[in-house]
Amino acid sequence: MAENLRFCGPALIADETMLHNVIQMITDIITKQHPCQLEFGPEEETAEAGEETSEFDWVVVDTALDVVSGMAAALGQSFAELWKVFEKTILRYASSGEALERATSVGVLAECINGMGAAVTPFTGTFLKLLLHRLNDEDPQTRSNAAYAVGRLVEHSQSDAEMLKEYPTILSRLEQCLSMNVSRLQDNATGCVSRMILRSREHVPTKEVLPVLVNILPLKNDFEENEPLYRMICQMYKWEDATIRELTPQLLPVFQAVLTGDEDQLEDERRAELIELVKWLNQMQAGAAPWVEQL
C-alpha cells in the first residue's frame, strides 16, 4: 500500500471512509493495539516467545510506518493535519532506547517532512530539537537518517529565524558525520550541507566546508543526494564563488566519474546542467575536459 500511495497519489484514500479506516488501522498498529499484536496465550508462552515476538512486533510496526510516509508523499501539504495523529507515537519511537526503532522513525520523519513541503513550517522547532539530538546518535543509521531529515527541513521550512539560528550547531554535528564512511552517512551529510548552502550560503563557511565535501566525492551510496549536491555546485559557479573555482581541478575528475558512470547517478535536469557547466569550464580552459564533447 505504501508504494501504491507513492506512485499513484491520493486516489487510494480519496474516499473519506477508506481514509478513516486506514488511519485507524495504522494508529492501532504503531501503538501496538492491533489484534495481531496482542498476546492472548498463557504468560509462560508469552515469555517463551521473547525476542522472536518482539522482532515480529517491530516488523508489523515498521510496515505501518512505511504507510505513514507513503501517505505523506501522496497527500503533500495536506498531510500536515494528519501528521498530528501520528506525531506523538513517531517522536516517541525516535527517542527509543532501541537503535532500530530510532533509525526507522527518524527515516519516516524525513519522508514526512519531504511530503509536507512548506506545510512543515509550524513543526520546525519541534523537529529541530529532536533531529539535532539524533545527529549525535551512537547509531550510524539513525545519524544518517537524521542528516537527511535535517536537509529536507532546511529545504522546506519557511521559518528562517528557527533554521538559521541552528546553522552553527547543525554544521558542527555534520562535520563529524562527514568523516564517517558508514551507512550512507557521508552522502546524507553532504546533501544536508548542500541544501544549507543553497538556502543561505552567507551562513555557511564555504571556504572551509567546500574542500571537505570535494574530498569525499563522488558519492558512492545514496545517489538521491547528488541532486542537491550538484545543484549547489552549479549554483556556486553561477555566483562566481572563488572557492569553488579554486577547486575546479579536483572537481573535473568527479564530474567525469558522475557523467560517464551509471546513469542513475543524476536526474535528467541535473545531468544537463552539469554537462553545460563542464562545457563552459572546458571553453574557459581549453582542453581541461575534452571528454565532455563525447556526451
Q: Predicted segments — roles?
A:
Residues 1-295:
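Karyopherin-beta/Importin-beta family HEAT-repeat alpha-solenoid scaffold
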